Amino acid sequence: MKVLILACLVALAIAREQEELNVVGETVESLSSSEESITHINKKIEKFQSEEQQQTEDELQDKIHPFAQAQSLVYPFTGPIPNSLPQNILPLTQTPVVVPPFLQPEIMGVPKVKETMVPKHKEMPFPKYPVEPFTESQSLTLTDVEKLHLPLPLVQSWMHQPPQPLSPTVMFPPQSVLSLSQPKVLPVPQKAVPQRDMPIQAFLLYQEPVLGPVRGPFPILV
């Protein structure tokens, strides 16, 4: 009985080992199949990625290719275009160009001769007016004032004055004034009269312009 029990236990153990081996084999096969499937899937993914990349590159090439074709259509010819003229057209006649001869020295000398023939403009010297010494008999007139080139306000003030001869003598009042006035009568002191040989310009500058009408000297009553 014990032997049969031992034999049954051994058979069960062997059966279990075989089952375990089968399970291990199946797991190994499943793992190998899973690995194969994984590799296959990876290959499919890589193939899909490569196809997508190739498709995008093709699309880019398709976009670039028409642009390059358009540029090539704008400039189809790189070399020079020969101008083929028909043989019936006659060539253009060239008109003869007349070149004037250079001026000879004889011709150039004509203006110089003209310049020598035409007299040059001579500048006349400025005439100097003679200055005569002032005498007692002389008196200033309008023409003398204009010749002196005096300022306009001074000339106008003199034009309103009546002409008066210049004399170094002292003028005394009439006898009627002497009879009515006090016994002591002093004449008005005259201004200093310039020398007789002094020119008119210096005499006019020496005098002071008179604003009112010129009258004779009046005596000073003391």
From Swiss-Prot:
UniProt note on tissues of expression: Mammary gland specific. Secreted in milk.
Alphabetical list of Pfam families matching this protein: Casein
Signal peptide residue numbers: 1-15
Keyword Transport (UniProt): no
Domain of life: Eukaryota
Chain positions with Phosphothreonine modification: 27
A single Gene Ontology CC term: extracellular space
Keyword Ribonucleoprotein: no
Modified residues (Phosphoserine): 30, 32-34
Predominant cellular place of this UniProt entry's protein: secreted
Compartment list: Secreted
UniProt keyword terms in alphabetical order: Milk protein, Phosphoprotein, Secreted, Signal
Function description: Important role in determination of the surface properties of the casein micelles.
Family: Belongs to the beta-casein family.
PANTHER family the UniProt entry points to: BETA CASEIN, BETA-CASEIN
Descriptive protein name: Beta-casein
Source organism of this protein record: Capra hircus
